[in-house]
Amino acid sequence: LLFPLFILLSNCEAQPQRELFNVLAGKDHQGPVLLGWHATGTHSARCSFDEFVRCDAGKIVCPDGTNAVLSAVAFEREVELTFSRPLVPGKRQEIRARVTDMVGNSLSFTVGIWGYNANPPELRINEFVTKGSSTNPDRVELYVKQGGNLAGITLYDGMSGSFDSECILPAFAVSAGDHVVIEYGERLRGIHPIEFWGGEVGLGANNGVISLYDAPEGRIIDAVLYSNRTSSSDEQYGGFGTKKVQQRAVLLQESGEWKPIPIVPESGVDSTYCTATRSICRTPGAADTDRAADWHVVPTGKASFGNENEKESYHP
C-alpha cells in the first residue's frame, strides 16, 4: 500500500538551500524547514522545524473535513496540534498548514499524520523468502513477542527513506506467539492463519534490506541485511552492486539495527542458497544480536511460514 505525501512550500525551496540575507537590512530571508511530524496521542500531533516558529490554528485545516485542529501551540522549534476527533490508528490524517519564523518568513505545507497506536505489539522479523515462485511466493514473517494491535505497523523492502515497497498493516489484534505473514504476488493464497498482502512486486532476490517500523516513516523496530556479494564485488557501490542497495545499507547502519559497523555486503545474511522453499529464518533459541549469525537457510522444503522456525540448516 503506497500513500502519497507531499510538501508545498511558499517563500522557500523544497530542498535545503544556502541561507540568504539582505545585506543592508541584515534580515534572514529563508523560510522555516519542516523536519518531521508524528502523532503524539489519540488527539495530538507534533511538527518539528529547523528554527523557532509561530503558528495559528486558523491556518491549519484538514482538507477531507473529517477532523479539525482545535489548537496549535508553538514552542521554540515545535508546534503541538490538538484535534477535535481521534487520529485513528493505521489511518492517515492529512493537514494543510502555514507557519512563520520570527522575522515573518513563511512555510506552507501539506502532510499526512498517521494515527496514534497506543497498543503496538512487540515484533521481530522472523523468516523471509526473496526468490519466490508462483506456488511459493516471496514472503516475510513477523513473530509477535508481546501482543497488541498491528495498526500502522509498516514493513519496507528497503528502509523508510529508500524503498521499493511499503506494506502498512491495518488494525488487527495479535497475541504473543502469533506469526504474521506478509505475502507478495497477485493475491493472497489464504494458507496462513494471519496473513496480509504486501503487493504484487516481490523482494530483491539476492541483495537488500528488509525493515520494520512502528508507523510509516516512524521508529524502526527491526531490520535484516541479506546479500550474496562481498566488498570486492564492485568498486563503485561498496560491493553492494547497485546505488539503491548501498544507500539502504548506509541508512541501516545509521539506524543502529545491524552489526558490525561499518556495514559491508559480507556482514549480511548469505542469500546464496536461499530458494522458494529454502527460507532464511532466525535460528530458534539464538540471541537477537542484529548480526548474520542470528539467521540460517533451512533445507529444501522446510520453510515454516506461520509456524515455529525450522532448526536444521541447509548444507550444500
Pin down the residues of each PLM region.
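Sec-dependent bacterial lipoprotein signal peptides
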Residues: 1-11
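Solvent-exposed beta-edge/loop recognition patches
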Residues: 11, 74, 86-89, 170-316
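A structural motif detector for short, solvent-exposed N-terminal "entry" segments of globular domains
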Residues: 13-27, 38, 105-163, 202-204, ...
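Residue-level recognition of beta-strand termini and adjacent short loop/turns
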Residues: 41, 75-77
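A short glycine/threonine-centered beta-strand motif
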Residues: 41-54, 136-147, 213
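Short, surface-exposed alpha-helix to beta-strand junction/turn motifs within ectodomains of secreted
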Residues: 45-71, 153-155
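Surface-exposed loop/edge segments in extracytoplasmic proteins
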Residues: 64-72, 162-168, 218-222
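Conserved structural position at the C-terminal beta-strand
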Residues: 97-99
